[in-house]
Amino acid sequence: MSFDGDELAGMVDPFGALSRAELSEAAREVAFRRGDDLDDAALAAAVDGAVAAYRLVVCPPEAVRFDGDGTDLLAVGPTAFPEPPEGAEDLPHILGVDRRSVDRERLGRAVVERLRGQAARAVDRGEHEQVRQLLDVSYDVEAWAPVDVSDVRERFDSALEE
């Protein structure tokens, strides 16, 4: 059994943010409820893919209220359309994880910094397809968080005009 980025986001959304271990536990629970097996390597790859596609984003510590052990938490990202998979409806009760408050503005600033870094690398390498994809992400980021990404878009536009 595997999950797409929107299903992973659908498992994270009710909690505000989850650690990778908590998300893995949630996915195992959903797989169990569906009578399916879960491949840990495939799940890790799906989570990595969701992060790469901005469906999930890593929360900087200042963006989430969490008395944890410093473990990175994942939150729903700007390109996600959270869709809990069948069998996920009871996860909040099963996992016993309280909802975490995520500061969207702080999280948005961290996402913008990541986007800027990826933009610089894509432009420097002349990766026009990557630039186009990141341009689309930039619009999603502004709709998702109270941040301004116009400077990044200007760089994308300039690179695509060359």
Model segments located where?
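Positively charged, polyanion-binding regions of nucleic-acid-associated proteins
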Residues: 1-18, 45, 111-120
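Charged low-complexity interaction tracts in eukaryotic proteins
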Residues: 3, 18-21, 31-33, 37-102
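Residues that form generic nucleotide/phosphate-binding pockets
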Residues: 11, 46, 50, 155, ...
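The alpha-helix within a helix-turn-helix
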Residues: 24
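Glycine-rich, aromatic-bearing surface loops/beta-hairpins
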Residues: 106, 110-162
